[in-house]
Amino acid sequence: MSGEPSAGDEFDVVISGYGPTGLAAASLLSKRGHRVCVLERWPSLYGQPRMATIDGESARIIQAACDADAAFRNSLPRRRYILANEKGETLLDLPWDRDHICGFPLRISLHQPDIEDAMDFAARQQGAEINQGWEVLSVSPSESFAEVTARERSIGEDNNVKWGRTRTVRAKYVIGADGARSAVRESLDIQREQWPFRNAWLSFDAVRKRKLPNILGVSPDAQVAVIFCAPEGRAHSLIPLGKEHIRFNLEADPDGDHSDKLNRDFAYRFLADVYGLSEDDVEIYRYAFYPFEGKLATTWRIGRVFLAGDAAHLMTPFLGQGGCSALRDAINLSWKLDLVLSGTANEAILDSYEAERKPHVRVYIDGSDSLGAMAFVKDLEAAKTRDANYQAGRVPPVPRDPFLKSGIIMSSSAKAPAAIGHLAPQGVVRRGSVEGRFDDVFGWGFQLIGRDFDPAVTLNADQSAFLKRIGCVVVGVGDSQDGLAVDADGTYRRYFDENGVSAVLVRPDFTVFGAAYNPADTPFTVDNLRMQLGA
């Protein structure tokens, strides 16, 4: 179809792109009952792994977007991350064998297609309109809506692109989640900041056929990711991908033509020469050229159009935060769009999306860029100096996970609780006969949680009505039932003890908006949120 949009072509949100960012946004927004239209250039989900790992915060986002058990059915905790020299000597060893505050392992080794299938199923079940095989051509924002024009796209038997109908849809808001070559970003002529380090992997994904032998002192079956530096050769790495899959990477020229290497013969020669593996050990099913670099869009919003995920930022893979950052974009923008679309918040809160997310992403781009440049040193003397420093314990600090210092949070003055702006916990709770992770028991959204008291008793009618309008769960958590949810694994007791607070008000992206030192301060926290939302 073409021409003026009909009633069936008008939506609350149009999402360009249906990778992890678009999938998460489509699921979260449709869960809230909004009319969502997805336009994706490829005819189906990609179906192959790209992300190798996510952190516990991202796992909680996926939990909000779909059935987490289905999403992680082939995943395992990632135990360690090692940087080694070409002799196999450890330079950097990051232990990851503990739990994340969000209720999942600190890092998860995953099979990405499972996650995408689960989010796709949720989005469709919740009524999102998913249009695969439609490539966005242009985006035209106006004061009251944005129009998106797309064209039907398919690949013929001759492997050439075939174009079909043109369609124009109209939405109150548009999310450009269409990747590094974003048509939305290009349509709006948004530029990008460039980081200095660039390189590439030749990636070979495989299924393990049997227990693998130790490789340079590391067991590939132990959920340990290892990068081997090679100043006189080519760096390489082995990365577990959940229960059955594994990725082998080999350094490549990011500007070179590697078509002669993306095949079975080259891949197995590489595995035999470097790792001593053969077809008896693994079955390779994917051959890919993966260039990487750091880039950041100069703006993430023009009027009613937003960028998210790889359309807004790229980073090298060495901190495993590219996909995590994309999922954070999706949930941050989704909960704010939800409130604006439902009329429970002022549109001005959308300005906080870029203000909150951009500095957060920059930390990870900087950190992964620095780690990659260090791992790929090609000067032999510089590599020897690096090795000596690392083996002597003179290791540059890995960036700590950033937290919010401004945006939609209570004042972070000296008197304010330190928990503000940090991630809130998710523990196991029991309500009646139901026991599970907090979000599974109570649902996704705002959370007002009191320690050993029900926060509802401290609120007046207006405050309670406001929390109901924004879909906030209000619950007390304690050691015994007595009208409260039971803190089954002690997570909340430990959290409240460590932070010295009696209540926390948590945003839908699991960031602590505000906290109260004592129950009597709880109403002030609620009023502050109401003021900031303009509700």
Residue positions per predicted region:
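Helical substrate-recognition/capping region of FAD-dependent monooxygenase/halogenase enzymes
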Residues: 1-12, 16, 31-32, 85-88, ...
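Core beta-strand elements of the Rossmann-like FAD/NAD(P) dinucleotide-binding domain
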Residues: 9-11, 161-173
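N-terminal Rossmann-fold NAD(P) dinucleotide-binding loop
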Residues: 22-23
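Glycine-rich FAD pyrophosphate-binding loop
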Residues: 30-50
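Active-site-adjacent segment of FAD-dependent monooxygenases/related oxidoreductases
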Residues: 48-122, 230
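FAD/FMN-dependent oxidoreductases across multiple families
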Residues: 74, 260-322, 360, 364-367
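A conserved short coil-to-beta-strand element within the FAD-binding core of flavoproteins
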Residues: 132-147, 151-155
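Conserved FAD-binding catalytic core of PHBH/FMO-like flavoproteins
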Residues: 156-160, 173-292
